[in-house]
Amino acid sequence: MNMFFDWWFATSPRLRQLCWAFWLLMLVTLIFLSSTHHEERDALIRLRASHHQQWAALYRLVDTAPFSEEKTLPFSPLDFQLSGAQLVSWHPSAQGGELALKTLWEAVPSAFTRLAERNVSVSRFSLSVEGDDLLFTLQLETPHEG
């Protein structure tokens, strides 16, 4: 410890002044950075509070929005006997079933619409020509309700 003091007092006054100025500059810099750090932290806290309020407002909007469950029609293969479509066969299964229709080209898209209204999905389908008619075969799946 005495060596440090001996060195300090042995240096020129100009070098000691430069050391004092350097250490004073370092101290001022640390104080300045510390204050900006506090300002950034306070701004971050305000930002988090603002985000929390916005999320709370969004949750209130979601909770107040009316939830309307769409009513689905019950599925019946006889619903597909319309003009331009004739039911050929229906083979029910636990997962859904297979529906075969003799139909016109124009009736094919409406069959998918009617299935969607009844909450029935199509896993596979095929279209084949039999004479003058179109054989439309659908592999259907009903959703599992639990």
From Swiss-Prot:
Q: How does it sit in the membrane?
A: Single-pass membrane protein
Q: Which UniProt keywords apply?
A: Cell inner membrane, Cell membrane, Membrane, Transmembrane, Transmembrane helix
Do you know which Pfam families this protein is assigned to? Answer: HofO
Instruction: Give the record's GO biological process terms.
Output: carbon utilization; DNA catabolic process
Presence of the UniProt keyword tRNA processing in the record: no
GO annotations of cellular component type? plasma membrane
Q: Does the keyword GTP-binding belong to this entry?
A: no
Q: What happens when the gene is disrupted?
A: Mutants are unable to use DNA as a sole carbon and energy source and show decreased competitive fitness when cocultured with wild-type cells.
Mark the transmembrane ranges. Answer: 20-37
Where found in the cell? Cell inner membrane
Could you tell me what this protein does?
Required for the use of extracellular DNA as a nutrient.
What protein am I looking at?
A: DNA utilization protein HofO
Q: Which organism is it from?
A: Escherichia coli (strain K12)
